A protein has these predicted regions:
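Helix-centered, glycine/charged polyanion-binding patches within enzymatic domains
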Residues: 80-159
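Active-site beta-loop-alpha junctions of metal-dependent nucleic acid enzymes
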Residues: 56-81
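Short, flexible loop/turn motifs enriched in small residues
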Residues: 35-41
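Short, conserved catalytic/metal-binding motifs centered on acidic residues
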Residues: 10-19, 44-50, 68, 87-98, ...
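Active-site- or DNA-interface-adjacent structural scaffold in DNA-acting proteins
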Residues: 1-32, 46-48
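C-terminal domain-tail junction helix/linker
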Residues: 164-185
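Short, catalytically relevant binding-site loops at active-site mouths
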Residues: 19-20, 59-63, 75, 96-99, ...
Length: 185
């Protein structure tokens, strides 16, 4: 059924515009970079190859460093104990540069933190990259998850349902990865 204004479509019995999500439930907040529209932030922890290990959902206005502990505690697989020979590294971007609070939360869980400091140059004086940035691994995983239509636009009112869909998509990513590796053997 066509609405009264140009570009507005209505579904019988509902007053939504085309392109809007169906509901806005819990764990939704105003996005500080998108004219304060409601949005969802997905904090995700991935391994070195991009396999998702933990996912946490919050409102778009929640800072990254406040979700760090919940993300690290949400790992669903048993991880090996770090040792002197095989330490576990955790690379974080500038959003986690909040001083001793973040470093302590990371160190308590047995990780060696690598936090890019605000204002820190990426290049050494000779112009060479000492440690190449690895944030693209997380961005690639978020891109893979965004291919799932139910995750890209949030239609669920309850955050637990939305988180469940994200976890199903993560399982699908692991399945595809395992299937691809089995074909190479």
């Amino acid at each position: 059924m066509r609405g009264s204004r140009r570009g507005e479509f209505r579904v019988a019995g509902r007053g939504r515009r085309y392109g809007q999500g169906a509901f806005w439930g819990d764990l939704v907040g105003p996005n500080p970079t998108d004219r304060a529209k409601n949005g969802v932030k997905r904090s995700i922890l991935v391994e070195a190859d991009g396999g998702p290990l933990s996912v946490v959902v919050a409102g778009a206005n929640v800072p990254d460093f406040k979700l760090l502990e919940a993300t690290l505690d949400g790992i669903v697989v048993d991880r090996p104990e770090p040792s002197e020979d095989t330490p576990e590294h955790l690379c974080l971007d500038k959003g986690y540069d909040k001083g001793a609070v973040v470093e302590e939360a990371v160190a308590v869980r047995g990780y060696t933190p690598h936090i890019r400091r605000i204002g820190e140059e990426k290049l050494d004086p000779a112009g060479n990259k000492r440690y190449p940035a690895r944030r693209w691994v997380v961005e690639r995983t978020l891109g893979w998850l965004s291919k799932c239509r139910a995750i890209l636009v949030r239609y669920e009112k309850k955050a637990s349902n939305y988180l469940g869909l994200i976890k199903v998509a993560c399982i699908l990513l692991w399945y595809r990865r395992q299937h691809r590796l089995s074909l190479l053997r």
